[in-house]
C-alpha cells in the first residue's frame, strides 16, 4: 500500500515548480469561487436547477457541484459509470461542513479536488519529461508551463466537470507505463486493473487507453491467458455490468416516472383542448370534434418543431451519421477543416475574444474566428513544432503510445463527430500529446545556439499564451 502512495511524494528538484503550480491552481479555482460564491453557497432543495441555470463557463457541466451538494447519479452512467460514487465521500464531507457552517461549501470541497488533480497532473507531466523522455530540467519546466498555458487546460482545472480528473489519471498512466518501458518492466495485473477502474470509472471511453498502455508496455504478454482474462476481460465486463446495474437501479425508475408524468400532462392537455374546442364552437358531433382536435395538436407540434429548429442549440447540433442510442451522438455535417483550425488546435489552446467562453447550446456559434492574425501564427507555430516533434521522436515507443491516445480522441471527435461542436472542452483528454512530442524536439536541439533558439521560441509562445489566456479568463470570471 505504501508503494502506491509513493508516487505522490514531491521530489527535491520538483519543489519550487510544484509550489508555483499549486499557487496557480489555487488562484484559478479562487476565480470560480469569487464568481459564483454568493449563489452557490445557498442551501436549496433543488441544487441541480440552481447550478445548471447559473453556471456558464463554455459548455462545461456543473453536475459535480450538484452531486457533492445532494448525492445522486446525475452523470450519464454509461459514460461515467463510477464518477458519482467517487463523489460520495466529498458529498459526505460537504454535508458535515453544511451542518457546521450553515452554508453550502461545495465550491471549496470540489475546488480542493480540482486543485489536487491540476497539481499532480503538472507533477506527472514534469516527470514524464524528466524520467521517461530525459529532457533537461529547464526544458521540463518550460514544457510543463507551456501545456498548462493552454486555454482549456486552465479552464478544466477550475470548473466542476470531470475532465481534469481524467487528465490526472491519463498522465499518471503514461508516467507509470513510460517508466516501465524505460526500465524494461511490465505492467502488472493489479496495476492494470487499478488504472482501468479509475480511468474508465471517470470516463468509460478512456478505459481503452489503459489497455493500449498495457499493450504497448507488455507486448505479446498482454495476450497471455492469465493477464488477458484477469487484467482485461474481467474488469471490462464488471465495469459494463456495473453500468447496466446502475442504469436499472438509479436511472430507469426516474425515466419511467418522467415518462408517466409527461403522458399524464399530455393527456390533461389533450382533454383541455377537447373541452375548449367544444365550448368555443358548440360542435356536438364527436367525429368532427376528434378531427378538429387532431388538427390542432398537429399544428401545435409543427409550431414547436419550427421554434426548436430556430434555437441556437438546434442550429449548432449537426446531423448524426446514423440513428441509434450511441450513433445519435455523432455528427457528419460540422466542418472538419474549420473545426481543426478554430477549435481543435484553436480554442483549445487560445481563447477567442469574441463569444468568450460561450456555450454552443446557448449563445456561441460553433465556428468563431480570431480577430488577429497573430493567433493564427502562434497556432501554426505550435502545430509545426508538434509535427517536428513527432518526426524527432518517431523511434520512441512511448511517443507512439501517447499519439495513440491522441489519435483515438481525434478519431472519436473529428472522425465520428462526437462532441465536435464543442471539441475544445475535451482538451484535457488528449492535448498533452503536443508538449510530449515537442519534448523529443528539445532532445534533438543539440548545440548551445540551437538549444536556446528552441527555448526562446517556446518561452515566447508560453508567455504569450499565459498572458493572453490569463487576461481573458480573469476578465470573464471577475467581470
Model feature map: region roles:
Residues 62-108, 291-388, 400-402:
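Lumenal/periplasmic acceptor-binding loop at the mouth of the active site in multi-pass
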Residues 9-59, 66-71, 234-248, 461-466:
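Transmembrane signal-anchor helices characteristic of membrane glycosylation enzymes that use polyprenol
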Residues 1-7, 207-236, 252-265:
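Perimembrane helix-loop-helix junctions
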Residues 112-133, 384-388:
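Transmembrane-helix motifs of polytopic, lipid-linked glycan transferases
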Residues 165-182:
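Specific aromatic-rich, kink-prone transmembrane helix
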Residues 125-149, 400, 404:
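Transmembrane-helix signature of polytopic, membrane-embedded enzymes
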Residues 187-206, 210-218, 230-237, 456-460:
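Membrane-interface alpha helices of multi-pass inner-membrane proteins
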Residues 158-163:
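Short acidic/glycine- and proline-prone juxtamembrane loop motifs at membrane-interface regions
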Amino acid at each position: 500500500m505504501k508503494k502506491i502512495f509513493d508516487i505522490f511524494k514531491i521530489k527535491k528538484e520538483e519543489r519550487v515548480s510544484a509550489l508555483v503550480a499549486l499557487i496557480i491552481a489555487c488562484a484559478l479555482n479562487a476565480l470560480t469561487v469569487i464568481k459564483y460564491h454568493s449563489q452557490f453557497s445557498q442551501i436549496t432543495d433543488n441544487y441541480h436547477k440552481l447550478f445548471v441555470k447559473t453556471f456558464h463557463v463554455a459548455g462545461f457541466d456543473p453536475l459535480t457541484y450538484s452531486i457533492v451538494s445532494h448525492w445522486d447519479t446525475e452523470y450519464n452512467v454509461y459514460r461515467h459509470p463510477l464518477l458519482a460514487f467517487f463523489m460520495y465521500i466529498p458529498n459526505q464531507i460537504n454535508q458535515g461542513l453544511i451542518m457546521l457552517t450553515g452554508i453550502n461549501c461545495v465550491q471549496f470541497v470540489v475546488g480542493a479536488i480540482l486543485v489536487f488533480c491540476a497539481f499532480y497532473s503538472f507533477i506527472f507531466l514534469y516527470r514524464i519529461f524528466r524520467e521517461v523522455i530525459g529532457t533537461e530540467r529547464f526544458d521540463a519546466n518550460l514544457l510543463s508551463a507551456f501545456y498548462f498555458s493552454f486555454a482549456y487546460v486552465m479552464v478544466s482545472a477550475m470548473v466542476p466537470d470531470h475532465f481534469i480528473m481524467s487528465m490526472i489519471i491519463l498522465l499518471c498512466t503514461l508516467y507509470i507505463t513510460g517508466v516501465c518501458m524505460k526500465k524494461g518492466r511490465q505492467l502488472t495485473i493489479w496495476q492494470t486493473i487499478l488504472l482501468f477502474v479509475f480511468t474508465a470509472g471517470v470516463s468509460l471511453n478512456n478505459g481503452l487507453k489503459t489497455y493500449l498502455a498495457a499493450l504497448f508496455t507488455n507486448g505479446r504478454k498482454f495476450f497471455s491467458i492469465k493477464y488477458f482474462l484477469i487484467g482485461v476481460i474481467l474488469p471490462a465486463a464488471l465495469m459494463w455490468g456495473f453500468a447496466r446495474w446502475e442504469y436499472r437501479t438509479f436511472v430507469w425508475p426516474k425515466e419511467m416516472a418522467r415518462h408517466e408524468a409527461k403522458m399524464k400532462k399530455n393527456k390533461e392537455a389533450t382533454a383541455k383542448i377537447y373541452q375548449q374546442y367544444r365550448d368555443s364552437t358548440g360542435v356536438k358531433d364527436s367525429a368532427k370534434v376528434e378531427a378538429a382536435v387532431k388538427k390542432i395538436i398537429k399544428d401545435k407540434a409543427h409550431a414547436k418543431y419550427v421554434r426548436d429548429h430556430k434555437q441556437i442549440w438546434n442550429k449548432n447540433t449537426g446531423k448524426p451519421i446514423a440513428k441509434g442510442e450511441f450513433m445519435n451522438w455523432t455528427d457528419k455535417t460540422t466542418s472538419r477543416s474549420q473545426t481543426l483550425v478554430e477549435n481543435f488546435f484553436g480554442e483549445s489552446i487560445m481563447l477567442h475574444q469574441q463569444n468568450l467562453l460561450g456555450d454552443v447550446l446557448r449563445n456561441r456559434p460553433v465556428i468563431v474566428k480570431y480577430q488577429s492574425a497573430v493567433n493564427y501564427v502562434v497556432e501554426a507555430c505550435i502545430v509545426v513544432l508538434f509535427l517536428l516533434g513527432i518526426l524527432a521522436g518517431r523511434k520512441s515507443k512511448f511517443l507512439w503510445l501517447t499519439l495513440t491516445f491522441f489519435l483515438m480522441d481525434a478519431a472519436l471527435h473529428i472522425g465520428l463527430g462526437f462532441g465536435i461542436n464543442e471539441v475544445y472542452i475535451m482538451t484535457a483528454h488528449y492535448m498533452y500529446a503536443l508538449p510530449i512530442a515537442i519534448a523529443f524536439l528539445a532532445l534533438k536541439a543539440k548545440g548551445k545556439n540551437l538549444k536556446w533558439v528552441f527555448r526562446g521560441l517556446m518561452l515566447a509562445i508560453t508567455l504569450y499564451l499565459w498572458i493572453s489566456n490569463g487576461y481573458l479568463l480573469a476578465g470573464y470570471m471577475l467581470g
